[in-house]
């Protein structure tokens, strides 16, 4: 991929309008009308499903006994390696980590990026991290978007970009880990972003910064969306299931169009969307 191919994609992202940090209420779709910005919630690691997940895969030993960042990365590597990525696979009925790992082994198959990010999200929640799976969307959806994770580091007091499909995280030129909002902003401002050396697809194809960040993710960072409730079995449909509400962070002058049953809210306020999970 030449820079010539990436330029129009980066240009679209760079031409997006900015955010509005003074906005105090979201744009509401469906019947979910509210005058206040809704709260993000994170499932407690003592939830019985998360406790079972932690024990089932012995996540404590997978995370290891190093510092917080090493645990975050070890869980990323584990999900990247435990199932293959297959972007064309049909989504399983039961969308939780235990069920999906078993299904992939049994049927010798993979899952798509959305399922991989939900698995990593459950593992982070089970290990006591605040985490979300984030759908990264292009300005115009033609055939592809991408789903990754934002996990909150207490030691760095910020959200971090973790992508289980590509075993990927991003730093600045000094090696400081970056979050999704920071990567987007740096791409918009032509500031340096660095992809980890071992970023890859299915342990076969090495990923480059030029393709993965300047082209693929520049395309997919026009707006981002996630459920307000970060939980186990987030998108498994079962009797009595309360479907999560989704919120999109969109640039001013743009609308996600509140897809029925999915996006309930749009916000232009990035400091709200990326607020600390410990913020009162």
Regions found by a protein language model. Give the residues of each.
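N-terminal targeting leaders that direct proteins to extracytoplasmic destinations
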Residues: 8-16
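Secondary-structure boundary elements
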Residues: 17-111
